[in-house]
Amino acid sequence: MNTKETIDAILAETGKAVLGKDDVLRRILTAILAGGHILIDDIPGVGKTTMAVAFTRTLGLDYKRMQFTPDILPSDITGFSMYDKASGSFRYVAGSAMTNFFLADEINRASPKTQSALLEVMQEGRLSVDGKTYTVPQPFIVMATQNPFGSSGTQELPESQTDRFMIRITVGYPSRENEIEILKGSRRSAALSLRAVITPDDLLQLRKAAADVHVEDSLFAYMVDIAAATRESHDISLGISPRGTMALSAMTRAHALMEGRAYATPDDVLAVAPYTLSHRITLSGDARFAGKTAASVLDAILKSVPMPELV
């Protein structure tokens, strides 16, 4: 299979367990190909865990899930050293993050210290325990979920932490027809029976192919102009950082690959910008008072920044 056929096969296989959420699956796979992590804002019970299991099966990845609660410790994520009487030395006991695909369920129920431990692993790709450094397996993907802020026992993730996630999306309720189909059979069981379409090494090759997608200089300038517009907007108190621009570039390349192209276009930028950038924007007090949202302000900016004409 060529690259486009492989990507389509992954989506088709994953879609057997996740009904009616093709757009969500495409966004998640795009972020995975871009080498990023995923943050999902939604209520419990809309299929987030099923999505995670489905992707780990189709991508051939090891998988661990942790239900975050206030009593979860950083060492539960990173691991710890244990004294081994037989050898007379300390040995490392791996934490939950030592895997390919880590589902951090309800991350905003954990303490800030525990959240920071996970975000450090996400950023560095390695973790430190008692002065020793351990590298997480590659590929390494974190899918974190959080309940809407204000739900019992939750605390909002600060901007410095949400900025570490390449995309922030919602799943939403299923349609009436799809919910009926869900009632007819267990989607979770269907996810467990999915076949592996590719191997972890294949995924690394797909990531390399995404990174090699050609981007014209004028398109890089377009991305920077979008970021600059967020920094200059009176509706925004904190605009897109260079990290956000880099995420936009990676997502643009990955989206082009998803579409079967070896080159990126302005349409790729516009397709991924809403869910790659909106969580990196902090609105001004006046904008919030006026009822504006990060999504609506970003949409206005995307419409105002001139698109380049590629040669």
For the regions a protein language model found, what residue spans apply to each?
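Canonical AAA+ ATPase core
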Residues: 84-89, 110, 114, 122-213, ...
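Walker A/P-loop
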Residues: 32-69
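C-terminal engagement/docking regions of AAA+ P-loop ATPases
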Residues: 232-311
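Walker B catalytic acidic pair
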Residues: 42, 105-106, 117
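Dynamic helix-loop-helix/coil hinge segments at AAA+ ATPase domain boundaries and subdomain interfaces
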Residues: 1-24, 212-214
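P-loop (Walker A) phosphate-binding loop of NTP-binding proteins
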Residues: 43, 77, 145
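AAA+/P-loop NTPase substrate/partner-engagement loops
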Residues: 58-86
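Conserved alpha-helical scaffold flanking the Walker A/P-loop in AAA+ ATPase domains
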Residues: 27-30, 83-103
